[in-house]
UniProtKB/Swiss-Prot annotation:
<comment type="similarity">
    <text>Belongs to the globin family.</text>
</comment>
<dbReference type="GO" id="GO:0043177">
    <property type="term" value="F:organic acid binding"/>
</dbReference>
<feature type="modified residue" description="N6-succinyllysine">
    <location>
        <position position="11"/>
    </location>
</feature>
<dbReference type="InterPro" id="IPR050056">
    <property type="entry name" value="Hemoglobin_oxygen_transport"/>
</dbReference>
<feature type="modified residue" description="Phosphothreonine">
    <location>
        <position position="8"/>
    </location>
</feature>
<feature type="binding site" description="proximal binding residue">
    <location>
        <position position="87"/>
    </location>
    <ligand>
        <name>heme b</name>
    </ligand>
</feature>
<dbReference type="GO" id="GO:0031720">
    <property type="term" value="F:haptoglobin binding"/>
</dbReference>
<feature type="modified residue" description="N6-succinyllysine">
    <location>
        <position position="7"/>
    </location>
</feature>
<keyword id="KW-0349">Heme</keyword>
<keyword id="KW-0408">Iron</keyword>
<dbReference type="InterPro" id="IPR012292">
    <property type="entry name" value="Globin/Proto"/>
</dbReference>
<keyword id="KW-0561">Oxygen transport</keyword>
<keyword id="KW-0479">Metal-binding</keyword>
<dbReference type="Pfam" id="PF00042">
    <property type="entry name" value="Globin"/>
</dbReference>
<comment type="function">
    <text>Involved in oxygen transport from the lung to the various peripheral tissues.</text>
</comment>
<dbReference type="InterPro" id="IPR002338">
    <property type="entry name" value="Hemoglobin_a-typ"/>
</dbReference>
<dbReference type="GO" id="GO:0031838">
    <property type="term" value="C:haptoglobin-hemoglobin complex"/>
</dbReference>
Length: 141
């Protein structure tokens, strides 16, 4: 559960990302594919090379979903319901992959925004990504 301080930290950190969210999403996906090669199996139709238009487009989708979640911190299950259905029923993504992407997102954000990435912000973003992952895997049961 995100505390009021966590919510403030998440909103502040995401605002710092600003118009770079799509680029950061794509970079996090690239990190995930390189660090955890088994995640590539969910994207057999993608060109997974560095700078790929398909990875950039999917990175923007990831970033847009996270922006939506940040805008609905008090109702993430409602805001992400359709995305949860998609990943659980159609795409059948193994839930562990959300943790892997969350880690790669944290690394990407820390590398681009070191001044804003304090220990408190790191902890709040980690809790936020865990909450998003929980929502996205809630329809698996």
């Amino acid at each position: 559960v995100l505390s009021p301080a966590d919510k403030t930290n998440v909103k502040t950190a995401w605002n710092a990302v600003g118009g770079q969210a799509g680029e950061h999403g794509a970079e996090a996906l690239e990190r995930m594919f390189l660090s955890f090669p088994t995640t590539k199996t969910y994207f057999p139709h993608f060109d997974l090379s560095h700078g790929s238009g398909q990875v950039k487009a999917h990175g923007k989708k990831v970033a847009d979903a996270l922006t939506n979640a940040v805008s609905h911190l008090d109702d993430m299950p409602g805001a992400l319901s359709a995305l949860s259905d998609l990943h659980a029923h159609k795409l059948r993504v193994d839930p562990v992959n959300f943790k892997l992407l969350s880690h790669c997102l944290l690394v990407t954000l820390a590398s681009h925004h070191p001044a804003e990435f304090t220990p408190a912000v790191h902890a709040s973003l980690d809790k936020f990504f865990a909450a998003v992952s929980t929502v996205l895997t809630s329809k698996y049961r």
